[in-house]
Design a protein with these regions (language model features):
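Surface-exposed cleft-lining segments at the edges of enzyme active sites
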Residues: 81-82, 107-123, 158-163
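N-terminal, active-site-proximal structural segment of metallo-dependent hydrolase catalytic domains
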Residues: 1-47, 51, 57-63, 78, ...
Length: 251
């Protein structure tokens, strides 16, 4: 069973850059998107054999998530059920017979770390939400988690220590989340692999130089780890400042 996650940084723009062909070539069972940056009715996008679920931000052209699936879920939940967090289209949960699939786009701490305090609250509430699901059945979490966990996960750790996405506070929240019973699928297979990134700034020819960050993840409940077949970063796929990431589970 194949899962794809991609921060498209504006779905309408990516549709004009070959999204349909990329979607078809990856042939995922579940294809999760973050930063769709659109409202209901702005794009008529459907694929044969797939159902789709969308969570839009109240603010136009901002955030937003979506999931395309070949498998009809038992239920669909939008957001965390906490009003403070549920106006930016950041979370969709599909309940499947044997697992939950959660795609998410946590809030960026922003320049000057002006949203760091809110990000800390969001992280704590999101972890509690995931633990509640995990108590019922295993969980697969994917998305642009807006944090590079370890120094190995970005090209220039020393110069980014106090920047959004690599603060000690954000990294510690990721450590806490993993400690709550989750496995980072990519590091499970490649614990020491360097220069493996999923996001590159549009500035300074960063992608050409592979001066990137690994901030797009698949996390799985620890008890699913032995069912993982592969984890892949598709850095050959363009169209966004992020590339898609993939998880394959044995059926």
């Amino acid at each position: 069973m194949k899962f794809i996650s991609w921060n498209v940084n504006g779905l309408r723009a990516v549709v004009g850059k070959g999204f349909a062909e990329i979607f078809a070539s990856l042939d995922a069972d579940f294809f999760c998107l973050q930063e769709t940056k659109m409202q209901a009715g702005q794009l008529d996008l459907a694929f044969d054999g797939y159902e789709s679920y969308w969570n839009y931000a109240d603010k136009k052209g901002y955030s937003g998530t979506a999931i395309f699936t070949k498998h009809t879920p038992l239920s669909v939940t939008y957001g965390l059920g906490i009003d403070e967090h549920d106006h930016e289209g950041r979370v969709i949960t599909l309940e499947m017979p044997d697992f939950y699939l959660v795609t998410c786009y946590p809030p960026n701490s922003q320049d000057g770390l002006r949203r760091l305090d809110y990000r800390m609250t969001w992280e704590d509430d999101f972890r509690v939400y995931l633990q509640g699901l995990d108590a019922k059945k295993p969980v697969i979490v994917c998305g642009d988690l807006n944090v590079a966990h370890k120094e190995i996960d970005l090209k220039n750790p020393k110069t980014n220590r106090k920047n959004a996405g690599f603060t000690d506070e954000e990294r510690e929240k990721m450590t806490t989340l993993l400690g709550a019973g989750f496995t980072d699928s990519f590091r499970f297979f490649y614990p020491d692999l360097t220069d493996a990134y999923s996001w590159w700034s549009y500035r300074f020819r960063a992608r050409e130089k592979n001066a990137g960050w690994r901030i797009d993840y698949f996390l799985v409940s620890n008890r699913l780890a032995d069912k993982m077949a592969s984890a892949t970063i598709h850095n050959e796929i363009f169209g966004s400042d992020h590339c898609p990431v993939e998880l394959v589970l044995n059926d």
